[in-house]
Regions:
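Long, Lys/Arg- and hydrophobic-enriched amphipathic alpha-helices
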Residues: 1-113
Length: 113
């Protein structure tokens, strides 16, 4: 059972959602299984679900980082690498965040999935 699903994050830590308004990221845990069931009940729609790591890698985040960092200093490259790792590492944001595509069943679009 999910509870306390509306959350605020400030400086990489959970914070009170009503404090520091405008300087916190607000997130919400979604019950994707329920969401898929609702979409399926509508009819004519299809869903794809993956984690943030797979999605970002499939849309080329590593290649993009390589292109951007080509003319950067070592320190900037290292910083970019650490940021990229945070986004795609399974122990950080890579498996924590999910991406869902809802599309018409006849649509073959699957970029990132």
């Amino acid at each position: 059972k999910m509870k306390n699903t509306l959350q605020a994050v400030s400086n990489h830590k959970f914070s009170n959602i009503l404090e520091n308004i405008g300087n916190s990221d607000i997130t919400h845990n979604i019950n994707f299984n329920l969401f898929k069931k609702i979409v399926k009940g509508i009819g004519g729609l299809d869903t794809e679900l993956t984690n943030q790591k797979k999605f970002l890698i499939n849309i080329g985040i590593k290649k993009r980082a390589e292109i951007i960092s080509a003319k950067q200093t070592f320190l900037k490259k290292a910083d970019m690498y650490l940021r990229l790792q945070r986004l795609i590492d399974e122990k950080q944001m890579g498996s924590l965040f999910k991406v869902m595509l809802i599309k018409n069943k006849n649509n073959k679009f699957k970029l990132g999935f």
